[in-house]
Amino acid sequence: MKKIPLKFTALSLSLLLSSIASAEELSAKQSLDKMTQALDNLNYEIAFVQTTPANMDSFRYRHIKQDNKTYAQLVTLDGRQQEIIQRDNLVSYFQPNAQAFTLNSGNIVDAMPAVVRANFDKLSSDYDFVKLGKDRVAGRFADTIRIVPKDDFRYQYLVFIDEENGLLLRSDMLDREGKLLDQFRVVTLYIDDRLRGLTDYINKVSLPPLLKESKNEQSSDITWSAGWLPQGFSLIRYTQEILENEIIDSALYSDGLFTFTLFVSNVGSNDLPENTWKQGAYTIYSEVIGGKEITFIGQLPISTAKRIVQEVKFR
């Protein structure tokens, strides 16, 4: 019987293993879904740095799921310590020289990029998910994925997802030219082994008073509306407050990845100039239209913010 040369056997085996690996490799969408599931279901501790063009801050975040309840803690690692703790559906804030308070919330959102909690089924109509390959972050292998809008009205994300456990290791928010606006970057990651005692600690904390949420006004109370929004954005909440005897309307909009708020108030003059301010991912743009000052604050390009403001409609 004729023997098959060893080098050809090795080559065949290599090709077979390569094809199996390719078949098992997750798509970009599957990797993103795995990331959102890992965030809520794994027990882990991360130390990370959040960087903008103006600031760099470091944090430690710990998360554990126990008895169908979620416990989490976020603490600052620079300057005076600030702490946020989560006891299931209650999130409490402790800051120096400020009154502690508690909110009804299912997760800690501060300092964490919005991409970790995004609904990628919903986003798929407005964004493309492109897998770029492999990289290393914090000593761990990561899948690299670009989240690209299908229009020119918003920013993009570059994310690095732990190949083994699905946790987000790094995210870069980039403008349309690829300039970095905001970065989340994990420095150290531990799974399970450093979380002993977290639930005991959180359960012993005396939670501060629960804040009442601002009243969400009925749609019939709204005297204005956004005449144009980028596709996928919708109204999340509308509130009306009185500040120094002046009524100020605010409306929060989101597409599930980026958010912005419109503020509308009366002004005494139509001659006020338009104002624009930008830092990192955040844009502030205001303009007076029909005796109303309309202010945009959010994570969209200036050109988009300006169009949204100028197309506000009043009844």
UniProtKB/Swiss-Prot annotation:
It is found in: Periplasm. One of its GO terms (biological process) is regulation of polysaccharide biosynthetic process. GO terms for molecular function: antisigma factor binding; lipid binding. It comes from the Bacteria. InterPro entries: MucB/RseB_C, MucB/RseB_C_sf, MucB/RseB_N, MucB_RseB. GO terms for cellular component: outer membrane-bounded periplasmic space. Residues 1-23 form the signal peptide. Its main location: periplasm. Keywords: Lipid-binding, Periplasm, Signal, Transcription, Transcription regulation. Coiled coil: none annotated. Binding to RseA is inhibited by LPS fragments; phosphorylated N-acetylglucosamine (GlcNAc) with N-linked acyl chains are minimally necessary to disrupt binding to RseA. Once RseB is no longer bound to RseA the latter is susceptible to DegS degradation. Thus if periplasmic LPS levels increase the sigma-E regulon is induced. NCBIfam families: PRK09455.1. Belongs to the RseB family. Homodimer. Interacts with RseA. Negatively modulates the activity of sigma-E (RpoE) by stabilizing RseA under non-stress conditions. Although not essential for association of sigma-E with Rsea it increases their affinity 2- to 3-fold. When bound to RseA it prevents proteolysis by DegS, which is probably relieved by lipopolysaccharide binding (LPS). This is Sigma-E factor regulatory protein RseB. It comes from Haemophilus influenzae (strain ATCC 51907 / DSM 11121 / KW20 / Rd).
